[in-house]
């Protein structure tokens, strides 16, 4: 297994799919990385040599991935909560942030139902 950005990349998959195992790298970003390096997206990771893997590592290093990206996202949410703005309040109460209705749905965000005490 190749190791890129601190993540073990599966050898038996295509390079495009394998790169998506890195947090912050989706299909589009993976295709851009492989295009910049000059590797066909359908190439298996096991067929790549060390120089190609080093080139991929250099390209991935230009993006914010893994721990840095997670920290950035959590700091953005913390900033909204500290400001006390509408979005921050919704984050604090574990409710949907982007305007979805909560009368009937939003069970994923609200958590399991609580029984009524009569």
From Swiss-Prot:
One of its GO terms (molecular function) is rRNA binding. GO terms for cellular component: cytosol; small ribosomal subunit. GO terms for biological process: translation. The keyword Transcription does not apply. PROSITE patterns: RIBOSOMAL_S13_1, RIBOSOMAL_S13_2. InterPro entries: Rbsml_uS13_C (IPR027437), Ribosomal_uS13 (IPR001892), Ribosomal_uS13-like_H2TH (IPR010979), Ribosomal_uS13_bac-type (IPR019980), Ribosomal_uS13_CS (IPR018269). Residues 93-118 are annotated as: Disordered. The keyword Ribosomal protein applies. It comes from the Bacteria. Keywords: Ribonucleoprotein, Ribosomal protein, RNA-binding, rRNA-binding, tRNA-binding. Residues 106-118 have a biased composition (Basic residues). HAMAP family: Ribosomal_uS13. Part of the 30S ribosomal subunit. Forms a loose heterodimer with protein S19. Forms two bridges to the 50S subunit in the 70S ribosome. PANTHER family: 30S RIBOSOMAL PROTEIN S13/40S RIBOSOMAL PROTEIN S18, SMALL RIBOSOMAL SUBUNIT PROTEIN US13M. NCBIfam families: uS13_bact (TIGR03631). Belongs to the universal ribosomal protein uS13 family. Located at the top of the head of the 30S subunit, it contacts several helices of the 16S rRNA. In the 70S ribosome it contacts the 23S rRNA (bridge B1a) and protein L5 of the 50S subunit (bridge B1b), connecting the 2 subunits; these bridges are implicated in subunit movement. Contacts the tRNAs in the A and P-sites. This is Small ribosomal subunit protein uS13. It comes from Psychrobacter cryohalolentis (strain ATCC BAA-1226 / DSM 17306 / VKM B-2378 / K5). The lineage of its organism: Bacteria, Pseudomonadati, Pseudomonadota, Gammaproteobacteria, Moraxellales. The gene is rpsM.
């Amino acid at each position: 297994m190749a190791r890129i950005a601190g993540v073990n990349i599966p050898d038996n998959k295509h390079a495009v799919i394998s790169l998506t195992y890195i947090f912050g790298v989706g299909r589009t970003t993976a295709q851009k990385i492989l295009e910049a390096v000059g590797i066909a997206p359908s190439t298996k990771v096991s067929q790549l040599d060390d120089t190609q893997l080093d080139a991929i590592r250099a390209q991935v290093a230009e993006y914010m991935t893994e721990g840095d990206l997670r920290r950035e996202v959590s700091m953005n949410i913390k900033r909204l909560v500290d400001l006390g703005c509408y979005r921050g309040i919704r984050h604090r109460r574990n409710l949907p942030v982007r305007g979805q209705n909560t009368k009937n749905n939003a069970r994923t965000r609200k958590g399991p139902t609580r029984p009524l005490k009569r």
